[in-house]
């Protein structure tokens, strides 16, 4: 999967790097270093005197320490700090040099003397003593460790242990089970949170595990002709459905039981969302009983039609024919990973864009956005209910249904709303996270559909930054959390599997469940388990204008305080001369990748047009008006608008970073302005309430922004710590060729480019 050859230099230095003695100081107390362990976490194997490589061409910045393999992570423990690494982002579950076992993609061991290298798999034998260990991670990191001073047998054992525990064959071997078992036995809490999570975000996020959550969603959207069905309570009909779901009121429970056997996996039609005009979004699996297919199809569509106030005809969309398959998506993502991880920068720089295009990843992102935009037209303009159909109804429909709701409903563009959307359309709708994320190393079922969805959301966030309450840091953290085997949110193929497997595990461990349906795993939405309140402020978007509390009246989402609709086009990442992505005249000398190119008819033809339905006109009309960020948003589908998600895919690549630059510099300034506005508003409220009292500033912890005016002169407020990968740091987590200390790196850090090499050599 990955190239095993050593990378060539990415940048040529005019100075020989300062070499430090590789031999370890005998006085170093590495043996006394201890890992930080979670409840249920045990040390499987460890090796002392390991060197973590920071750059492949020099040992000057390498770190010495202990490499520890546990049943949860691979951990490198050192007393040294990484040079040039200054950032204020810390995961409370994982150390700076820790990687969860479920985040490991591939393990390669090397013996320099024998010139041998091998990809380690589960329960494989190793016939040589490794001198080097290379770990390829699912988040595109590369970690390199040298065993020059370590005991050969100890190094061999830790490599074999890592291969064994990072490739489990049984679901109950994942760390979350041991963690929860310890919490139940000790009746304790972690960071003040119960085993199943608590936290502010978690408590306010509907999990859709109960009847009441679905009922509230019906009322929120005004779906008066739909009802919550409990026919699958106890998973009596289907193990691929939630216990509670929403169906047309005209369909009786007996009808559902009768027709369920005809659907693949017995996945009957599931209601997703209702428009204020009465049109509904529904998803279902294919009908496998060909003899009764027409009869059942008519009965289901008739029930959906009767739930519409206009009795509009249902529009069916077969996703298996309209969007790429899960196999094609996996192939594209593998090529993207290969491009971002393996190839040396200097070899791929000239052909990087063409290589990116050949992966087809951005093409697939665009195709899903186009499909969702077409369905937005059907629901919003044509006022027709839409039925999403695919073979099993639990893969492609998760992506499309979620994108449609994001474009139509501003509630899902808030943090709580977005989390409830993932719970409703992914977790409770039985998206197979276990198989698609490949937690058990069954590569034949792997496909990054959830990553694709987050990428599509990121595209919308880039185009409409003021429409979303969350930031791309939040999206990246959600992506990373799907690789941590601690949260039940992204660990199972279905809610039924969670209940079944956890109940079996509880019986084996003699855990008393009481009235609970299975073990209660921590929820990923309890962000206090991973991040401090300060770091969680990075989730808040200072550009977000929908900060007023939304309410629902007859299905229409409204706001108590509405802002002007005529927003500046620059807030959407577009030049001022463009109205919603459209321009009347083309520039006289347009740039190669200018966004001010005229949106010609042939460009619009790239969007699927249904004959006679006016989709093209709807698309044109929408883009000819200022965007209402409290209403419908449509994606800009021109090739220049679909970009690579650099913070997620290229954050560990030093060559791709911009020191003191990138979007974070603007984010820094906007956050400071937003913080000052928040302070002034607080003072104004205090003055209006108590005119004669002394007006004070709000408590710092109550400020929603990460960057604050009161910290302007501290390290947090300084641009020195910022780069385009903020809050992540590429230094120390990727063994690329070192650019530290070269004229180029000094120029990027503000040095004058005409300094001689002698001058640079004399600098500290």
From Swiss-Prot:
Pfam families: 3-PAP, Myotub-related. SUPFAM superfamilies: (Phosphotyrosine protein) phosphatases II, PH domain-like. Gene3D superfamilies: Pleckstrin-homology domain (PH domain)/Phosphotyrosine-binding domain (PTB). It comes from the Eukaryota. InterPro entries: MTMR10_PH-GRAM (IPR036004), MTMR10_PTP (IPR030573), MTMR12-like_C (IPR022587), Myotubularin (IPR030564), Myotubularin-like_Pase_dom (IPR010569), PH-like_dom_sf (IPR011993), Prot-tyrosine_phosphatase-like (IPR029021). GO terms for molecular function: phosphatidylinositol-3-phosphate phosphatase activity. Residues 208-649 form the Myotubularin phosphatase domain. GO terms for biological process: phosphatidylinositol dephosphorylation. One of its GO terms (cellular component) is cytoplasm. PANTHER family: MYOTUBULARIN-RELATED, MYOTUBULARIN-RELATED PROTEIN 10. Belongs to the protein-tyrosine phosphatase family. Non-receptor class myotubularin subfamily. This is Myotubularin-related protein 10-B. The lineage of its organism: Eukaryota, Metazoa, Chordata, Craniata, Vertebrata.
